[in-house]
Amino acid sequence: MTPEEFWKAVNYLNVLGARQEAGLVVAGLGLEHYLDLLMDAEDEQAGKAGGTPRTIEGPLYVAGAPLSEGEARLDDGVDPGVVLFMQGQVKNTAGEPLAGAVVDVWHANTGGTYSYFDTTQSEFNLRRRIVTDAEGHYRFRSIVPSGYGCPPDGPTQQLLDQLGRHGQRPAHIHFFISAPDHRHLTTQINLDGDQYLHLSLIHI
């Protein structure tokens, strides 16, 4: 490595931090996914295999979303998007319903941006925590999110361009699921019909 290459790398890291894209580049390069693989291996060695596979968290989670019992509305009604209804059931690895589990859900708006980071949105828009009912069920109303890409003028996209890779993600929804005496689950789903459904920038 030459001194010029070394300082170019240092300057890149400075720009990455200034643009607050460190969490984006580690996800885009697969480093965060590698962390999941390490934790999966540790769980398997400890005899804790089974259940829904974990996926990456990503850099856009915000703690403290409003808590609801059984059901919630995620959107604030400002964004005229397509209405989305989703329901599910939380179960343990034996297939038994988990009452009182907390489903922490968040996603982007129709413009592909997230509340808190996009200050034009209301606080905790498209972010809620839902406590499952006696049968482990939860449900929510929201709007269909949009996919999005890395900022085109940012350091992450600059690196991806040099690697010959796009920076796009399909529309998706994030989940944290937790319950007493159970492992915390981080997962997400991609929405069917998106052109990047099977071509996402990020391995989840």
Question: For each predicted feature, which ranges?
Answer:
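Beta-strand-dominated extracellular/periplasmic modules and repeats
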Residues: 1-201
